[in-house]
Amino acid sequence: MQGSVTEFLKPRLVDIEQISSTHAKVILEPLERGFGHTLGNALRRILLSSMPGCAVTEVEIDGVLHEYSSKEGVQEDILEVLLNLKGLAVKVQNKDDVILTLNKSGIGPVVAADITYDGDVEIVNPDHVICHLTDENASISMRIRVQRGRGYVPASSRTHTQEERPIGRLLVDACYSPVERIAYNVEAARVEQRTDLDKLVIELETNGALEPEEAIRRAATILAEQLDAFVDLRDVRQPEIKEEKPEFXPILLRPVDDLELTVRSANCLKAETIHYIGDLVQRTEVELLKTPNLGKKSLTEIKDVLASRGLSLGMRLENWPPASIAED
């Protein structure tokens, strides 16, 4: 129970009921009165609109120029085939854009398991039917583009793609979210003598590309990250103090003596008024070889010493020398 009337009850995860691999029910309690709807509605909206995932975005079918057509030997029209392709549940690792291929011939259903893909791709629903071939000589060949995204993106919003795409490349409305259904319910909860508390029950179904528990965890993380700005609200009114980055790397401001060159090389550089490492790196090999008494052996020594410090001759330094050196 609370130690003070101003303290809020901290909810705990009471139960996770795994109805199936894609269907789960999560129960959270106790919540202060009203917080069940506050949190439940926020999580529901995020789960429906903001979960990242992979979806079919473009399809090329051999012999098909546009979606308002049909293909000989295929029972479904092209619009229905595209609609079925939207139902593919795909998981892609380490890539944001992949091309899958499908080639099938002979009578029978064409299913997701007939799609050819590499090791970075996993099709979660291999039994998903894409179309049916109705003739022994019928065949279908297609290339399916799968991209990573978030939420729902209609094909009509990708206008730049429509203008650039070749004839025969069909755009598909992309539903990236792996969440298929989400509902929440707020029930009464009790802690000791308090009976006005909430219990939040979230029921969630996904397409299998993401486990229900992980989906809720990600949604809660997104919500928490968005609310972080309000936690630091007082700091927003204060001007942000930007750390001034040094204009030049500190090593460039050090004297040439720090390179510990031989006496001959050091004296030649001083005679040319090269006092700082920043002065030296801006000189080219040709310029240094014109220096009296500085030969190829000394030049090689200078290049090796600079290279050991990640520097080289012929570098360009904007705004050199800095004010601190110019004043000396």
Curated annotation (Swiss-Prot):
One of its GO terms (cellular component) is DNA-directed RNA polymerase complex. Pfam families: RNA_pol_A_bac, RNA_pol_A_CTD, RNA_pol_L. Residues 1-234 are annotated as: Alpha N-terminal domain (alpha-NTD). It is an enzyme of class 2 (transferase). It catalyses: RNA(n) + a ribonucleoside 5'-triphosphate = RNA(n+1) + diphosphate. One of its GO terms (biological process) is DNA-templated transcription. It comes from the Bacteria. The keyword Nucleotidyltransferase applies. Residues 248-328 are annotated as: Alpha C-terminal domain (alpha-CTD). Its EC number is 2.7.7.6. Homodimer. The RNAP catalytic core consists of 2 alpha, 1 beta, 1 beta' and 1 omega subunit. When a sigma factor is associated with the core the holoenzyme is formed, which can initiate transcription. DNA-dependent RNA polymerase catalyzes the transcription of DNA into RNA using the four ribonucleoside triphosphates as substrates. The N-terminal domain is essential for RNAP assembly and basal transcription, whereas the C-terminal domain is involved in interaction with transcriptional regulators and with upstream promoter elements. Belongs to the RNA polymerase alpha chain family. This is DNA-directed RNA polymerase subunit alpha. It comes from Haemophilus influenzae (strain ATCC 51907 / DSM 11121 / KW20 / Rd).
